[in-house]
Amino acid sequence: VLDSVQFGRIMRESGATVLYLSAGLFNQVADQLAEVFAQLRYLIVGGDVLDASVIRRVLRNSPPQNLLNGYGPTETTTFATTCRLNDLIDEGSQKIPLGRPIGNTQVYILDGQGQPVPIGVTGEIHIGGDGVALGYLNRPELTAERFIPDPFSDAPDARMYRTGDLGRWRPDGAIEYLGRNDFQVKIRGFRIELGEIEARLAALAQVREAVVVA
């Protein structure tokens, strides 16, 4: 995939019409794959915050029929919301909305007491529905912390996932991402827990204190 020329050839020869790219890879190959993008029915980009300038450039020079921002953590089967960007991004846009929940998925933005926040107010994004995983393998404490009962669902034993992502509802019904409520960062779509790195460094005999920033 890192060889954009070869990847473009494979896409053309296969006749593929749907493509998913991580945000980092999309930014890297957007110009080289312009011809491929223009032939797609769906181009889905996700895994990190999208760069509005790259989105505008693709829509201006090589727009696919549908360019989607796909949002959702692995714990909810990767995609929980989508947003079609073709007619949404203008020259002044800096933030790319996450969009609305996909089918059989519920998204709640809750305050610190677990109550829904009003439109425009920041809260933590929680995701419920059929895509929520059972939990983490051999990590019952973390499972109990992140996968919690869904009080808004009528389904028996329904649970929702606490994402740690901050967001708010826009007046148009779309969700806007506002950052994290912890020290997790993403690099090229991969989760990095800064606290885990700090703990490893602090465990070294030669280290008295450690702070990791990104």
Provide a role label for each language-model segment.
Residues 1-97, 104-106, 111-116, 141:
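Adenylate-forming
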